[in-house]
Curated annotation (Swiss-Prot):
Name this polypeptide is given: Large ribosomal subunit protein uL6
Protein family according to the UniProt entry: Belongs to the universal ribosomal protein uL6 family.
One Pfam short name: Ribosomal_L6
Transmembrane annotation, as ranges: none
NCBIfam families the record matches: L6_bact (TIGR03654)
Species the sequence originates in: Synechococcus sp. (strain RCC307)
InterPro entries referenced in this protein's UniProt entry, alphabetically: Ribosomal_uL6-like, Ribosomal_uL6-like_a/b-dom_sf, Ribosomal_uL6_a/b-dom, Ribosomal_uL6_bac-type, Ribosomal_uL6_CS
Molecular function per GO: rRNA binding; structural constituent of ribosome
Subunit annotation: Part of the 50S ribosomal subunit.
One GO CC term, this protein: cytosolic large ribosomal subunit
Keyword Ribonucleoprotein included in the entry's annotation: yes
């Protein structure tokens, strides 16, 4: 039995949860999310809380118990508060800007790299070097932030590239010349 899965997910005000079988729909001020949970768990709602429990004692359902509880908790938090990830762009001439729903990144290539924001995700840029990816779906926000970082990952010698805010880059010493 999962320790995380035992805790019920509290539902804040202005958030509504609909459960039909293994499909969970969550609506709130930041948007609406829907997810189909895997087999082996049962979901119920009572007293402004959602409870996830394993449907049987098999290993697979016990493994998925904590996962499903966390997925529901992230959906509730996403539609009430939202999620965001910040990325720093480091390097001479490296910059970003938003054009409509597109993020345009100049990262040392011969052409600027354009990224479309998927449904439910927004890009914001401060000072041309700080990109904020925000939205209600934690998984989608994390994937889009990883795609932005993947345009030019930080390199270990000078630290140039796109990194998450607060990420530590392992630095290496350069070659030592002949003496």
């Amino acid at each position: 039995m999962s320790r995380i899965g035992k805790n019920p997910v509290p539902i804040p005000e202005k958030v509504s949860v609909e459960i039909s079988g293994l499909t969970v729909k969550v609506k709130g001020p930041k948007g609406e999310l829907e997810r189909v949970l895997p087999d082996g768990v049962s979901v119920s709602q009572a007293d402004n809380a959602v409870t996830v429990s394993p449907s049987d004692t098999s290993r697979r359902s016990r493994e998925r118990h904590g996962l499903c509880r966390t997925l529901v908790a992230n959906m509730v938090e996403g539609v009430s508060k939202g999620f965001s990830k910040k990325l720093e762009i480091i390097g001479v001439g490296y910059r970003a800007q938003v054009k409509g729903k597109k993020l345009v990144v100049s990262a040392g290539y011969s052409h600027p790299v354009e990224m479309d924001a998927p449904e439910g995700v927004t890009f914001a840029v401060e000072n041309n070097t700080l990109v904020t990816v925000s939205g209600a779906d934690k998984e989608l926000v994390g994937n889009e932030a990883a795609k932005v970082r993947g345009i030019r990952p930080p390199e270990p010698y000078k630290g140039k590239g796109i990194k998450y805010q607060g990420e530590r880059i392992l630095r290496k010493a350069g070659k030592t010349g002949k003496k």
